[in-house]
Amino acid sequence: MLFRSKAFSHSLNQLNEGDELLIQFPMLHHSFFTTSLVKKARRRGVKIYFIIHDLDALRFMNGQAVPLKHRIRMKIQESGLLGAADGIIAHNPIMKSVLVDKGIAEDKIVSLGIFDYLIPNFEEKTGLSKNQPIIVAGNLAQEKAGYLYSLPAEPAYNLYGVGFDESRALENENYFGSFLPDELPAALEGGFGLVWDGDSAETCSGVFGEYLRYNNSHKASLYLASGFPLVVWKQSALSHFVLENGCGIAVDSLHELKATIDNLSDTDYQDLLESTKRIGKGIRDGHYLLTALNNLK
């Protein structure tokens, strides 16, 4: 850890007054030393910004897998390091409010809205309909996506990713295997992309499910950039973005999903597709990060 702190210190020392540095958070290796190094760089006139990918103290605050003393240490380190920055890019207004509650100045924080997702050689999907299977991409293991093993009989689901227990596959699940990130968008087939975590189809539950109340899942950006409207948990932070931008639907339970889709007219679905195309282009163009960076200054 000391070696890594020295390496980070050496990198910061290469920067001069007026230089700006954007750091992805959480850093792979950080400690209490990191906060003092950031403060030292700022005193020399270097601007330090963080873009948040995860808040581990928030993600694991109720999880028993992480010992209490480690959770307390995590919380102190996160608050100290983020508080030392010139500016922070949070996922959304809900995450921003959590950071303000931690004592970080509100005017230092901007909301990203949604993560960008660059797709080389993008080709627009055609022939999409509301009755095609629901797409689930990502970590399909029991501990992350246990709900996959207790889904209602309808609608059908197309699964892409690692960790899926094929011996427990349901009749309405089609597993396509895993793909390289650049190959995945072209491989996806379906009518909606699902953002759901936890062990229950009734609601998003457990450490990963509860975390959706605060964070923006990267898979949401994958789906939208690929041209698919979203299905999200109604209590997730992401539901606000989805409903305000008309790029998907929100449900409390996956047991409601078939009826919700059935109640959509073909015109309703086409409207979702048009909004998804608009949002997806912005995501592929890097619009959301560029806007957030401009709003920091």
What does each of the following model-derived ranges do?
Residues 115-189:
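Conserved catalytic-core segment of nucleotide-activated headgroup transferases in glycan assembly
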Residues 126-127, 252-297:
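A charged, aromatic-enriched C-terminal amphipathic alpha-helix characteristic of glycosyltransferases
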Residues 60, 80-109:
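A short, active-site helix/loop in glycosyltransferases that binds the activated sugar's phosphate group
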Residues 12-33, 46-49:
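Short N-terminal targeting/anchoring amphipathic segment
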Residues 186-226, 232-240:
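Nucleotide-sugar-dependent
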Residues 10, 39-43, 67-88:
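Membrane-proximal helix-turn-helix segments that form the acceptor-binding/catalytic region
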Residues 20-22, 41-61:
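Active-site proximal beta-strand in glycosyltransferases
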